[in-house]
């Protein structure tokens, strides 16, 4: 917490990686809440902090529809059999969702709002194919999240703007070559 006007420090005290698998592989039928719950339970068991003393669970997840809908962060926590007094929130910043979850957790600690926060993420591409959320509104009369918005159409038109299209538009605007991008990626890829 804040002490005499000083900002609190935030520390990552542990990290557990969710299992990864191939599309339609051995993990394809495992619910995302169980995958996330597995690591949350393991994390709590590795530390001497009662599960009801965690103040929040912040998880990143994109395409939060179907089995990943309904605040998957809290669902993972509860699926792990952990305390039902701990809230959770799910962050969708697309491919940066889990990273953003870590930032939000750190900000909560550094602001003095919380002391113990769990951050991470879960995604199951076998249960929710990439871009499925883009078209989930079609049965309700919405082609995709953008083209029904007058403001969006006025600004960008009706063309689809995916991450891939956006990357190309950014590269063109700022004259970034593929070689420059790959050199940058080699510095940040872990």
Enumerate the predicted regions with their spans.
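Cysteine-centered functional microenvironments
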Residues: 21-22, 26-27, 57-60, 86-101, ...
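Flexible glycine-/small-residue-enriched beta->alpha junction loops
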Residues: 110, 116-169, 173
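N-terminal cofactor/phosphate-binding cores enriched in small/glycine residues
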Residues: 36, 40-43, 47-49, 60, ...
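Conserved small/polar residues in nucleotide/adenosyl-binding loops
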Residues: 188-190
């Amino acid at each position: 917490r804040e002490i005499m006007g000083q900002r609190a420090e935030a520390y990552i005290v542990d990290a557990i990686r969710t299992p990864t698998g191939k599309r339609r592989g051995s993990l394809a039928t495992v619910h995302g809440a169980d995958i996330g719950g597995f690591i949350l339970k393991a994390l709590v068991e590795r530390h001497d902090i009662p599960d009801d003393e965690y103040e929040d669970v912040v998880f990143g997840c994109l395409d939060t529809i179907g089995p990943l809908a309904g605040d998957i962060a809290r669902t993972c926590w509860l699926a792990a059999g952990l305390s039902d007094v701990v809230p959770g929130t799910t962050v969708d910043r697309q491919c940066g969702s889990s990273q953003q979850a870590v930032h939000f957790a750190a900000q909560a600690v550094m602001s003095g709002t919380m002391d113990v926060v769990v951050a991470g993420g879960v995604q199951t591409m076998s249960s929710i194919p990439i871009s499925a959320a883009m078209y989930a509104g079609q049965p309700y009369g919405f082609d995709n999240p953008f083209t029904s918005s007058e403001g969006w159409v006025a600004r960008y038109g009706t063309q689809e703007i995916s991450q891939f299209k956006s990357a190309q538009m950014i590269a063109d605007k700022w004259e970034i070559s593929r070689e420059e991008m790959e050199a940058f990626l080699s510095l940040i890829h872990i």
